[in-house]
Curated annotation (Swiss-Prot):
Bilayer-spanning residue ranges: none
Record protein name field: Glutamyl-tRNA reductase
Gene Ontology molecular function: glutamyl-tRNA reductase activity; NADP binding
InterPro entries in UniProt: 4pyrrol_synth_GluRdtase, 4pyrrol_synth_GluRdtase_dimer, 4pyrrol_synth_GluRdtase_N, GluRdtase_CS, GluRdtase_dimer_dom_sf, GluRdtase_N_sf, NAD(P)-bd_dom_sf, Shikm_DH/Glu-tRNA_Rdtase
Misc. remarks from the entry: During catalysis, the active site Cys acts as a nucleophile attacking the alpha-carbonyl group of tRNA-bound glutamate with the formation of a thioester intermediate between enzyme and glutamate, and the concomitant release of tRNA(Glu). The thioester intermediate is finally reduced by direct hydride transfer from NADPH, to form the product GSA.
Family per similarity comment: Belongs to the glutamyl-tRNA reductase family.
Binding-site list for substrate: T49, C50, N51, R52, S109, E114, P115, Q116, Q120
Database matches in NCBIfam families: hemA, PRK00045.1-3
Keyword presence, Metal-binding: no
Pathway it works in: Porphyrin-containing compound metabolism; protoporphyrin-IX biosynthesis; 5-aminolevulinate from L-glutamyl-tRNA(Glu): step 1/2
Subunit record text: Homodimer.
Its job: Catalyzes the NADPH-dependent reduction of glutamyl-tRNA(Glu) to glutamate 1-semialdehyde (GSA).
Site (Important for activity): H99
Amino acid sequence: MNIIVVGLSHKTASVDIREKVAFSPNSIEKPLHELVNLDGIVEGIIVSTCNRVEIYATTRDIAGGIARIRRFMAEYHHLAHDLLEPHLYSYHGEEAIRHVFRVASSLDSMVVGEPQILGQIKTSYGYAAEYKSSGIILNRFLHKAFSVAKRVRTETRIASSAVSVSFAAVELARKIFGNLTDKTVLLIGAGEMCELAARHFLTNGAKGVMVTNRTFERAQRLAEEFGGEAIPFDELFLHLHKADIVLTSTGAPHAIITPPDLEEVIKRRRMRPMFLIDIAVPRDIDPAVNEMDAVYLYDMDDLQQVVAANLEGRKQEADKAEAIIAEEIIQFYKWVATLEVTPTIVALRNRFEELRKAELERTLAGWKDAPPDAEKRLEALTSAFMNKLLHQPTTVLKKAGQGNRTDLYLDALRALFDLELGGTDTNESLELEE
């Protein structure tokens, strides 16, 4: 079984392409089911964030699996293949593993070291687990990716000098206005991105924060936390003129602010500049508003320019992180190698366990004067003997799984003990590996 990755990111596609292939978390069950029903695809996970849309899958047919997923990404969103193809990348084997470890560790993020991506991948994995599109390989793979990310964050300083995308938005605002001391900020959305932005804006001297959200209670909670004002979502345009800086990050499928919406707002502001930062994908603000006087709109692609200067300072820590990832790839491959031999090991242990129990029962049945603790003692004795007897062949088989003589050992063992390979329980397989 092979791990493959197909996707696009801020490195290969602009925001107008990324928003066309974004998967909504509110309807993720359908594409997950369609994904694992593709010919040759066994397991699948969809990761869809502002900056990337990626599919992690397992397949026995690498080339065919990659081709089918590339077609799926276009056809599911009713896009022409030619539109999407130039922006897609694909990996398999070691490169796929390395890519996902790097993504989870925030080495492939627009802002290296930002913490949001790990949480986003965990959420995506949660959907796959809930809708049963992931299995033994991707489950183990994603958990390994999470532990690699934790190790990178613990053993390097890659996060200490990192800034989030939200902070990059603040930096962009400072470049426009000079300082934020007399500026009022409006957050449209009450998620993690907006919460981080509120902290950064206030830390950098913003006068006040207003928050609006479709769920008013969430807006109230966030506004209360920062001493700001909560605004009902349907009253957005009654208050928009008060904001010097507007940051949007909602899950809306279409633009919620268009040029006609801003015409009266700009008049009420008496043409004072208005700075709009759209970090949502799909975008919350119609790009056409950038043509209006006194309106300055920036989206996720623009943020990349703000954070570029910070990347060089983190290069040394990133190099340490790459070394950690290289180590962890080796460890993960050792586990993958055991997958081929695990069914044979399980079958061998089951065969010996059957023999052990049969002989134990026969012995106890013929032992008329057996002491009360005889069964307990014999159970412990025979179990310990069996485990010691099987330790060496089990070890040899696991090592064989990492070499080029695997088939030789497996065929010999199956023939010698007439082993039948049934369905191997997932948990039992994992316990054997441990």
